[in-house]
Amino acid sequence: MQLSALTTLSPIDGRYQDKATALRGIFSEFGLLKFRVTVEIRWLQKLAATAEIQEVSSLSKEANDYLNKIVEEFSLQDAERIKEIERTTNHDVKAVEYFLKEKSEALPELAKVSEFIHFACTSEDINNLSHALMLKTAREEVILPEWQKLIDEITRLANEYKTIPLLSRTHGQPASPSTVGKEMANVVYRLKRQFKQLQQNEILGKINGAVGNYNAHLSAYPNINWHKFSEEFVTSLGLDWNPYTTQIEPHDYIAEYFDAVVRFNTIIIDFDRDLWGYIALNHFKQRTIAGEIGSSTMPHKVNPIDFENSEGNLGLANAVMTHLGQKLPISRWQRDLTDSTVLRNLGVGLGYCLIAYAATRKGISKLEVNEQHLRDELNQNWEVLAEPIQTVMRRYGIEKPYEKLKELTRGKRVDEKAMREFIEKLAIPADEKARLQQLTPATYIGAAIELVEKL
């Protein structure tokens, strides 16, 4: 069967392929091979620039330009050649080494030092740095920019609706009012914390040999400070150096990375569900799009499908990334191979994330606040003013203020007239009484507006 969007196994590359395109060049097999080629070439260039390694002369500009061109112009044809070699070697990293040795034959200067390609390296030296570069690239070029788009959209809602009052609900029951914008601001603040945590997450790498002790390195060049050499190389790639590892970099940072993404996603799930609920309560209307159908049998339906789509895909994303975070830091003794197949799925969870983020933004774009309904609902719940009234009563020493308001309001609908009459009978200063009399459920919003403006 010919491969197409209709025949792919995963909906990430099928139905939703346009949503996750930005990750393909990073986490695909092609992307992994390109990063491996990059690391191998940078390692050879580092060796050549080291005077103590006399067997590899300092490379000429022509040789360095040639190597850099292999990285910059790495093509699908190059990747296919590596896969062709792998069919013989049955070893993916060795296939990259042999590919580069083939390439080096075009330049005698490089052919002469081709045995220093992959010098003293274990496969995991190349792999861990490649995976780190993949995650770093994805974070900086895709994930954080996508997060910023969501934060900006929800911030826009916060500012646009900062003055529109909303009947809060705790335990599903009417509670002290807020504003629509303030509820959006709460989400923005939470998301910004996770943004900062992912942004600051260390992305670690190592290049220290088969068990992390530079055994092979020291056997060939015992007078080189390989510990320092390793640090210089890893940091030259823009990564943080991990000096203590077994054969593998232990992947703790990957768990931290995905944990931050999972937390961000969990906040978005909470947001999706709240918006779904607000739509159900008629707090928000959804703008209709010409030609769209909400139900195959009920023509009137306008469903909150975007928030539902987002919630579902974030659940899938979190399931994958939670497994990665729990599995990858565990490896038997100096290493086992269980991480290898799991690491090939680094981009899967993030792919579901991109689908979800696009859906949430689409859902937001359709929202239109139903201000009149919100005000009507507040006007039907004057009992929420029991809180400020009993608090003022406490201030002026009135006996059992809470109990008196409880008797008046608990489990009851109290209208404006009953609340005004209760206030009028209070033995409190006239100016305080007048202030309470002016209060309505729609104006009892505390510092909600100011809090949005301080965001």
Regions found by a protein language model. Give the residues of each.
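Catalytic-core signal marking the mid-to-C-terminal active-site face
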Residues: Q2-E29, D65-L76, I293-L455
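A helix-coil-helix interface module used to build multimeric assemblies
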Residues: Q2-H217, Y221-E232, G294, F307, ...
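Generic, well-ordered alpha-helical scaffold segments in large soluble proteins
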Residues: R42-L47, F99, K103, A138, ...
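Short amphipathic alpha-helical segments with heptad-repeat character
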Residues: K136-L144, Q148, A185-V188, K192, ...
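Conserved helix-loop functional segments at active or binding sites
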Residues: E160-I164, Q197-Q200, L204, T235, ...
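Glycine-rich anion/phosphate-binding loop at the beta-strand->alpha-helix junction
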Residues: Q194, T246-R335
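Active-site-adjacent "gating/activation" loops or surface patches in catalytic cores
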Residues: W226-Q247, H251
